[in-house]
Design a protein with these regions (language model features):
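Alpha/beta enzyme core
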Residues: 2-132, 136-147, 174
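Extended, intrinsically disordered, low-complexity segments
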Residues: 135-179
């Protein structure tokens, strides 16, 4: 099963927290969602994380106030999305890190300053995610690969950056699947 479930206060349609144009539901509505999730949970091993996107919509103080209200519901972790400065990151940690795990979301090119997991841990964050980093790395590689293929009409210039057929099969476990 799921180890943790994230419930957020964004309105529909959902947007990435680092994009503009978001809205947030009223605090009481979000508290109702959190209480319902906490009441419905069948195992204490399933954690409930409350996420707020209020910073972009209502400002840092509203985001902190919402996080405080969500903490009061009894959630297991907090996520204040798209903290924009090191000062805001520290403010969130100062207010919450000694009471509940905080999640830091590192999006390359997003709103939050990128820091290493160890730096974030020293600051007070206990959960760090780098969502989409693999997709951005793969997209960058694909741009280079297809650009090279279009120019040279062959994969030869790109071969040193590729796995060959046998290497790929070893990586994905094809020999074990065929036995």
């Amino acid at each position: 099963g799921a180890a943790m479930i994230q419930i957020e206060d964004q309105t529909f349609p959902k947007r990435c927290g680092h994009l503009d144009g978001k809205g947030v539901v009223p605090v009481a509505e979000m508290q109702g969602k959190l209480k319902a999730a906490l009441d419905a949970r069948q195992s204490s091993n399933t954690l409930i994380l409350a996420r707020t996107d209020a910073l972009a919509v209502e400002g840092i103080q509203s985001a902190l106030d919402r996080a405080e209200a969500y903490l009061a519901c009894g959630v297991d972790a907090l996520f204040i999305e798209a903290l924009r400065t090191p000062d805001q990151m520290q403010q969130a940690c100062d207010q919450f890190a000694h009471r509940i795990p905080l999640l830091a979301n590192m999006v390359e090119g997003g709103q939050t300053p990128i820091q290493s997991a160890s730096e974030l841990g020293e600051r007070g964050f206990r959960i760090v995610i780098f969502p989409g980093g693999t997709a951005r790395a793969v997209a960058h590689s694909l741009q280079g690969y297809y650009g090279s293929l279009q120019m040279s009409q062959t994969t030869t210039p790109w071969r040193d950056k590729m796995l060959n057929f046998d290497e790929l099969n070893q990586l994905i476990g094809t020999p074990e699947l065929l036995t």
